[in-house]
Regions:
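Catalytic or ion-translocation cores adjacent to nucleophile or general acid/base/metal-coordination motifs
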Residues: 111-129, 345, 352, 359-374
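Active-site-adjacent bridging/hinge elements
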Residues: 7-18, 64-77, 165-170, 306-329
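A short, charged/proline- and glycine-enriched loop
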Residues: 15-21, 82-84, 219, 330, ...
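Flexible, membrane-associating and regulatory peripheral segments of lipid-active enzymes
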Residues: 1-23, 44, 86, 138-146
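Extended, Lys/Arg-enriched charged tracts that mediate electrostatic binding to polyanionic substrates
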Residues: 187-214, 218-221, 229-231, 343-345
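Patatin-like phospholipase
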Residues: 32-199, 236-248
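Active-site gating loop/helix substructures
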Residues: 170-183, 217-359
């Protein structure tokens, strides 16, 4: 039942409302930059809601957050509105940005540094594996073919494509990519893993005092899809034969953050969990043919080269790979590819999670499906 603010006779009673959003982030090649922009707007809205609710003074440095604050203040006399994002499910590019947004919501951390991550580090020349990167005379027969393609684009396609074809940068990077290693993934898996670790680290450490954009007692659940290349055995009940054995390749990595009413934090999104979050980001975005399949040994090697520890490694394995462990499989042999291969739009995960939420005031529940259309 909706709770109402006390009011004197004759005054209009202020409505108390919680807008809860479950985000479903679509997976697709090259959508990471667009998803990042959406994530920043969602973070600005949630932060503006907390600012108005808690009557925090001072203008925000974010122009969009200031606009959201102004809007919420305008309606505050009639509606005491709190915006909460409590469920995020994502695949591939959506999975990466869902991970980053979840940690930002859990500990009230910034996402501004990720602009550089996507615009500068998310570059063909940066992602190419140095071992297979084209040299000056690699595949020289490709050069006249690329020149012909550029001429055809300028002649046959629209203005936007024509402008892109004339771009020296586009032509140089296309040449570099097509002349690099064939018949093996051209991009470096370890480079991508380092990017994910750097992206999470650039958000900053956990705050010394509890600080979160989640209301006390309200959990934030994150679901990231990936594809287990080898899969695990499972029984399927039929009529004749009564039971068959098949292999399940869909795999979900889940994380939860909860701050109790007395201030204690039970979170799987802390600074100590960064390697596990980076694991999920690398696995869900391991696009077949572009990146090599991801294995836990790759994460171990990158962390070792950096002199970093992973204290929660075994805890993460025990929690996330129960089916493999129950069948005696070695997690080191498991290989993961892009979550979009089998579960590109994880709406079912968000809908199922919504069913277990409680409320102590009026709630307007929305499931928001994010599919950028560049």
């Amino acid at each position: 039942m909706a709770s109402q603010q006390d009011s004197t006779p004759g005054e209009k009673r202020r409505r108390s409302l919680e807008l809860r959003m479950a985000l479903v982030c679509y997976g697709g090649v090259s959508l990471a930059v667009y998803m990042h922009g959406v994530s920043r707007e969602v973070l600005a809205l949630v932060r503006a809601s907390k600012t108005v609710k808690d009557q925090i003074t001072g203008r925000s440095d974010s122009p969009s957050q200031y606009i959201y604050e102004t809007l919420l203040e305008t309606i505050h006399d009639s509606v005491d509105l709190r915006v909460v994002v409590d469920i995020i499910a994502g695949a591939s590019a959506g999975g990466i940005n869902g991970i980053m947004l979840s940690r930002a919501l859990a500990f009230d951390l910034p996402l501004e540094s990720h602009r550089k991550l996507w615009l500068e580090l998310g570059d063909v020349t940066e992602l190419l594996d140095p071992k297979g990167k084209a040299r000056a005379w690699s595949k020289p027969f490709m050069r006249p073919m690329l020149s012909f393609v550029g001429w055809w684009q300028r002649k046959s396609l629209g203005q936007v494509a024509s402008d892109a074809a004339r771009s020296l940068e586009v032509r140089q990077k296309l040449s570099l990519l097509t002349r690099s290693r064939w018949f093996q993934p051209p991009f470096s898996g370890e480079r991508m893993t380092r990017m994910m670790l750097d992206g999470l680290a650039s958000m900053g450490p956990d705050p010394q005092s509890p600080s979160s954009l989640m209301p006390a007692g309200h959990a934030l659940d994150l679901f990231v899809t990936n594809t287990d290349f080898w899969g695990h055995r499972q029984l399927l009940s039929l009529h004749d034969p009564p039971v068959i054995v098949e292999r399940e390749h869909r795999h979900i990595l889940s994380f939860r953050h909860l701050q109790t009413a007395d201030g204690r934090i039970a979170s799987q999104m802390t600074e100590a969990d960064v390697p596990a979050l980076a694991f999920a980001a690398r696995a869900t975005s391991s696009f077949p043919g572009a990146f090599p399949p991801f294995q836990i040994g790759e994460m171990d090697a990158v962390l070792k080269a950096r002199g970093k520890a992973w204290p929660q490694r075994q805890t993460f394995i025990n929690r996330s790979f129960q089916a493999l462990l129950a069948q005696g499989e070695d997690i080191a042999d498991a290989a993961f590819i892009d979550g979009s291969v089998l579960m590109n739009k994880p709406l079912a995960l968000a809908i199922k999670a919504v069913q277990n939420r409680s409320a102590n005031r009026e709630v307007d529940r929305r499931i928001v499906y994010i599919d950028p259309n560049p």
